[in-house]
Design a protein with these regions (language model features):
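Conserved active-site alpha-helix within GNAT-family acetyltransferase domains
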Residues: 24-33, 114
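Vicinal oxygen chelate
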Residues: 2-8, 13-21, 63-125
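N-terminal beta-strand motif that seeds the catalytic metal site of vicinal oxygen chelate
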Residues: 1-27, 54, 69-71, 121-125
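Short hydrophobic/aromatic beta-strand element in the GNAT-like acyltransferase core
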Residues: 46-48, 56, 72, 92, ...
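Short secondary-structure junctions
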Residues: 34-41, 91-95
Length: 125
């Protein structure tokens, strides 16, 4: 993105914030989703996972906005990821064929925030 002066913004990290009602309950759920403990716990009501270099998911206690978020994760092998999630006790939804070879599945955290797994994602279609 260019600033008003025409210079590029220097973005180093992108953080997806997921508001929840109970950070400890959600921590356990996201630990199951990611298969590991959080990378950081910078404050009592926030835990975060680095999911790709420069890309973070922050789970933040915010009763007013809990359940209002959608986070999309593009994965290489959708079926393998879904099998792993089922093995860990999560319940992803049915796979839906989208467009141009893209396939989708969704699941919800304890507050109803939607997590979409996307197979067949490409930068250019």
């Amino acid at each position: 993105m260019r600033s008003v002066e025409g210079e590029w913004m220097s973005i180093e990290h992108v953080l997806a914030v997921v508001p929840v009602t109970d950070v400890e309950r959600s921590r356990r759920w996201y630990e199951t989703l990611f298969g590991r403990a959080p990378d950081n716990n910078p404050m009592p009501n926030l835990v975060e996972w680095q999911v790709v270099p420069g890309g973070w998911v922050q789970v933040f206690e915010d009763d007013q906005h809990a359940g209002s978020t959608v986070v999309n994760f593009a994965v290489q092998d959708l079926d393998t990821h879904l099998d792993q999630l089922k093995h860990r006790g999560l319940e992803p939804g049915e796979v839906v064929a989208a467009n141009k070879g893209v396939r989708l599945s969704t699941l919800a955290d304890p507050d109803g925030n939607k997590i979409w797994l996307i197979g067949g994602f490409r930068v250019h279609y």
